Amino acid sequence: MTDFSLYLVTDPVLGGGPEKVAGIVDSAISGGVSVVQLRDKNSGVEDVRAAAKELKELCDARGVALVVNDYLDIAVELGLHLHIGQGDTPYTQARELLPAHLELGLSIENLDQLHAVIAQCAETGVALPDVIGIGPVASTATKPDAAPALGVEGIAEIAAVAQDHGIASVAIGGVGLRNAAELAATPIDGLCVVSEIMTAANPAAAATRLRTAFQPTFSPETQTELSQTELQGAFVNSPSAPRVLSIAGTDPTGGAGIQADLKSIAAGGGYGMCVVTSLVAQNTHGVNTIHTPPLTFLEEQLEAVFSDVTVDAIKLGMLGSADTVDLVASWLGSHEHGPVVLDPVMIATSGDRLLDASAEESLRRLAVHVDVVTPNIPELAVLCDSAPAITMDEAIAQAQGFARTHDTIVIVKGGHLTGALADNAVVRPDGSVFQVENLRVNTTNSHGTGCSLSASLATKIAAGESVEKALEWSTRWLNEALRHADHLAVGTGNGPVDHGHLARRMTHAAETTPWAHLRAPRLDGATAASFTTPSTVKSPAPRIEPAGPFTRALWEASGDIIAGINSSDFITMLGDGTLRRPEFDFYIDQDAQYLAQYSRALARLSSIAPDSHAQIEWAQSAAECLVVEAELHRSYMAGKEVSAPSHITMAYTDFLIARTYTEDYVCGVAAVLPCYWLYAEIGLMLAEQNHDEHPYKDWLNTYSGEEFIAGTRAAIARLEKALENAGAEQRVDAARAFLSASVHEREFFDQATRHGWTMVGSS
């Protein structure tokens, strides 16, 4: 019986060309692929036939089933299994024409299609499909015209029906490490993947990770029946973090070399290991001396690691000499390991060459045997024996030539170029280019950026990401590390980047200690001076004045929250125009989600307001929210998919609905006011940085405009009046609601810079 646990569908385009497919398949089979389907939508029939013959020879030798997609005549001619889609040869006709000993698979997009083929087979007496490909699980770039996504629950429902009829099933479309374990708890028999393996730098490693993640026996029911020892044994080959080895020199001050590599590996979610090639006496001012231990000691270090630990990826840094390069190359060629990323350390910051001609030539030879090379602009020029590029296009052209002649992926890094952008790019051997936008950070503290990017890249590739996705993540992470480098205060020269800033920021954001104003003792609320406590951080002078003593007291109580908002990365980058567009788009999407619920809260206030004037104003505000929401969708989100509210957005809107529907009027007004007041204050502050070329000019104009400012003043006045008329207990509750809403406001702004960091290799 065929093992469908890991079913690979080939794609010559994703694989870098038809000539690369067989090599990818061979590697993937070594990693655990159990079924291979030849799918090629772009080549002519003769090319497909030739590819089928090549893969048949390979798969027969490896004992793996080969399936051909769509081509019934080729399947019959070569004795291959066949897979057809809903728009191909009708199933019953294909089953009758295909020899009985060959398996026939069918794409199923919904339950009706499965019921239909079961009924057709019963009516005609034709055998049921041997296997069905159910999907898509999620939207996928490899089949943009696919049916609507089913989700894991939809897959499970269809697979259960198939199982009842003795039909095997695999999940396809948007399948990867991120959902493999979840799919393993459904009745499906396997995972069907395309890009997860076809674009992987190491197909074998990618396949192994998928096989490890997909444990069909570990359903929620059976897990409870297994002992803890059995569970530990079952997952012994599923490490919690990719194991990444750095082979490089040292930096005692920690900014470069193995010290930077280990920080970068940890930042990327990996477990870092290191083998030292050279001991370097350097600091932020430069290199003083270099001591290279005997090669026998280097070999002993390598033996110590490889004899004991599985190495999921390797980052190569400073190798120093031709002998060292040759030894490392020999070692890598004779030992099992994951993808190799080579950072060709050849040029010092001063411009001096660090390697002699023989060592440079050895590095060029080594490049043929690694998966990714990450030279800076001067190093790329040396590798190509050319003058340094002065534009990104020139650098990409050099990289295309080197990638083609050395059959490796080259990362072009724009840091040494000039201009506002310091983009990075993936250049594949087939000449294809994937460019990652990256705004330049103006700092002299950039020591070790090359080491850091390469180590991060290796970690993300080891975690199962494509090189393109790995570069996107690493570029974004390193940009943040550069933006906060000046605050590290390490050394008096060109200091290091802040490798740990993202981790510290995320740790702080995850803190669950109740907010300070909720832990503080309740005040008596008798006066404006006794219903809340001033913040330990002085509040800035308000641009929109409080309407009286109560709202002034609330403003003075918010100093720490306001400071947190104003100094956040989101607000800082929004103001200077360096905010990444994906982060702004996410923010706008969540703002639209928020306004739909905020409108409900304002409408509720209209229904319980104590006077007709307030009722009318709240009702008008509620209507304006819906207008603004619609305008956000029209202006900023046209053509973009609208997502669901994040947990941060829901926490805020649920809080507002709860305060306005279950608490007194004054408490509800206090809860909704920070959205007005803080937004307007921030809008006026950011307006000072606005200009005609600002990428977010229109948004900044919206929240600093006179109409919004006037609405804010009116809302402040309504709260002041409500607090004047409220009882002491109501005032204290209202103050807490105002401060809680202000914290929610801070979290709402900050969430965009927390979005999109988790990748398939993260837990």
UniProtKB/Swiss-Prot annotation:
Gene Ontology molecular functions: ATP binding; hydroxymethylpyrimidine kinase activity; magnesium ion binding; phosphomethylpyrimidine kinase activity; thiamine-phosphate diphosphorylase activity
GO process annotations (BP): thiamine biosynthetic process; thiamine diphosphate biosynthetic process
EC number: 2.5.1.3, 2.7.1.49, 2.7.4.7
SS bonds (residue pairs): none
Superkingdom of the organism of origin: Bacteria
Residues that coordinate or bind Mg(2+): 70, 88
Cofactor binding notes: Binds 1 Mg(2+) ion per subunit.
The protein's enzyme class: transferase
Location of region: Thiamine-phosphate synthase: 1-210
Pathway(s) annotated for this protein in UniProt: Cofactor biosynthesis; thiamine diphosphate biosynthesis; 4-amino-2-methyl-5-diphosphomethylpyrimidine from 5-amino-1-(5-phospho-D-ribosyl)imidazole: step 3/3; Cofactor biosynthesis; thiamine diphosphate biosynthesis; thiamine phosphate from 4-amino-2-methyl-5-diphosphomethylpyrimidine and 4-methyl-5-(2-phosphoethyl)-thiazole: step 1/1
Record carries keyword Transferase: yes
Obligatory cofactor(s): Mg(2+)
Keyword Metal-binding: yes
An example Gene Ontology CC term for this record: cytosol
Binding site residues for 4-amino-2-methyl-5-(diphosphooxymethyl)pyrimidine: 37-41, 69, 107, 143
Keywords: ATP-binding, Kinase, Magnesium, Metal-binding, Multifunctional enzyme, Nucleotide-binding, Thiamine biosynthesis, Transferase
Region (Hydroxymethylpyrimidine/phosphomethylpyrimidine kinase): 245-500
Ranges for region Thiaminase-2: 550-763
Residues binding 2-[(2R,5Z)-2-carboxy-4-methylthiazol-5(2H)-ylidene]ethyl phosphate, per UniProt: 140-142, 174, 194-195
Role: Condenses 4-methyl-5-(beta-hydroxyethyl)thiazole monophosphate (THZ-P) and 2-methyl-4-amino-5-hydroxymethyl pyrimidine pyrophosphate (HMP-PP) to form thiamine monophosphate (TMP). Catalyzes the phosphorylation of hydroxymethylpyrimidine phosphate (HMP-P) to HMP-PP, and of HMP to HMP-P.
Stored HAMAP family: TMP_synthase
Family: In the N-terminal section; belongs to the thiamine-phosphate synthase family. In the central section; belongs to the ThiD family.
UniProt protein name: Thiamine biosynthesis multifunctional protein ThiED
